[in-house]
Amino acid sequence: MSFNHKTIEELHDLLVAKEISATELTQKTLEDIKSREEAVGSFITVSEEAALRQAAAIDAKGIDADNLMSGIPLAVKDNISTKGILTTAASKMLYNYEPIFDATSVANAYAKDMIVIGKTNMDEFAMGGSTETSYFKKTKNAWDHTKVPGGSSGGSATAVASGQVRLSLGSDTGGSIRQPAAFNGVVGLKPTYGTVSRYGLIAFGSSLDQIGPFAPTVKENAQLLNVIASSDVKDATSAPVRIADYTSKIGRDIKGMKIALPKEYLGEGIDPEIKETVLAAAKQFEALGATVEEVSLPHSKYGVAVYYIIASSEASSNLQRFDGIRYGFRADDAKNLDEIYVNTRSQGFGDEVKRRIMLGTFSLSSGYYDAYFKKAGQVRTLIIQDFDKVFADYDLILGPTTPTVAFGLDTLNHDPVAMYLADLLTIPVNLAGLPGISIPAGFVDGLPVGLQLIGPKYAEETIYQAAAAFEAVTDYHKQQPIIFGGDK
């Protein structure tokens, strides 16, 4: 019997009643991972021995009835540091890197007696939208194994969608939680910038990166955010705001809530069937008592261009630390220090990572800084101001998460511009540091469609309230891919 169909609260009740032990739950989770892994390829590392040791220790001291997460397995994206467990960022450059410390988000999970079951596959250094740039493998969509799972947190999304684990962590720099959540029909949240500590997250774009949760349902997603959100002196960008319970508004009605629907989010480049799905969702919100009105975010069309200048510039700086000297891959054909640097970085980084390093270095170079990086920062401010104007009158913004459903494997990985445009609807949220969630909202050609809800800073509770209200009157989150299996 698999437990992958049980909610976290149901699993907690079983653990407290001693109908199952943490060890049994961990063993069953490991079985679920193994039985599905060949089909989807969610994991880079499965930490079986460490997980079973931790489960045994939890059983020895007993499940804490007041701690919902006690004994619950957790999958962690492979750019989030885990002490004693390989953390590769899906790169040859870090193929053998074993951190000597835990990321704060992981430490918070351990403090709640969660069990890290393994590290999930991703695009190399989180640069990509399909989980095809990983050095190790290509992850496949849980619903259709000929399609991509999205990225960069593709493995974290498919691990939940395929029933391998109930909960996972990802990171989101330009849509890397929300896009794979949409493509796989699960719930993925990018919190407000600074809500979850970035300490221990392998940096890509430091002004954009944010760790966040994946789960099958809105409430479980909020329950995991309760665990990982915290202020942290180890992260200078950590926010002092801390909500006591992100589930506090779940179950409340949304009568009187004002929701904005940007016309730009339903314009050029958006699949007509995606547009129909979003408009149907808007009607559902109106039926629940909310007001939905069209607004404009005029500068959102510049988001992709702004993002790829800023994110690549930050990446070119952040990735300078990977040089083969102290840890990770080192080229064995180098004869002097210069060759160590050049050969290691040439051989250790994949094509997409090198492309972004070069783009960022160019944008920061003398003579081009003002025209590119400085200008991008100025347009970023205009995008932020657009959001501020809307949130002066509205509680939330509604739109599609992605312009299309999941695309085929090997169809866009040789066309970087087309791949970049897949993040058209998620990128502005990162540029503005806002919270955004993707929830299941329908299907097109048998593939899930994600609905995105965006709030002002620190409005995660309101986002969860609206998302849960929609979830309560729809059944999209209950539909599972064939691979999920298990008792229903």
Curated annotation (Swiss-Prot):
Pfam families: Amidase. It catalyses: L-glutamyl-tRNA(Gln) + L-glutamine + ATP + H2O = L-glutaminyl-tRNA(Gln) + L-glutamate + ADP + phosphate + H(+). The active site is at 77 (charge relay system), 152 (charge relay system), 176 (acyl-ester intermediate). Gene3D superfamilies: Amidase signature (AS) domain. One of its GO terms (cellular component) is glutamyl-tRNA(Gln) amidotransferase complex. One of its GO terms (molecular function) is ATP binding. It comes from the Bacteria. GO terms for biological process: translation. InterPro entries: Amidase, Amidase_CS, Amidase_dom, AS_sf, GatA. Keywords: ATP-binding, Ligase, Nucleotide-binding, Protein biosynthesis. SUPFAM superfamilies: Amidase signature (AS) enzymes. Its EC number is 6.3.5.7. Heterotrimer of A, B and C subunits. Belongs to the amidase family. GatA subfamily. Allows the formation of correctly charged Gln-tRNA(Gln) through the transamidation of misacylated Glu-tRNA(Gln) in organisms which lack glutaminyl-tRNA synthetase. The reaction takes place in the presence of glutamine and ATP through an activated gamma-phospho-Glu-tRNA(Gln). PANTHER family: GLUTAMYL-TRNA(GLN) AMIDOTRANSFERASE SUBUNIT A, TRANSAMIDASE. This is Glutamyl-tRNA(Gln) amidotransferase subunit A. It comes from Streptococcus pyogenes serotype M6 (strain ATCC BAA-946 / MGAS10394).
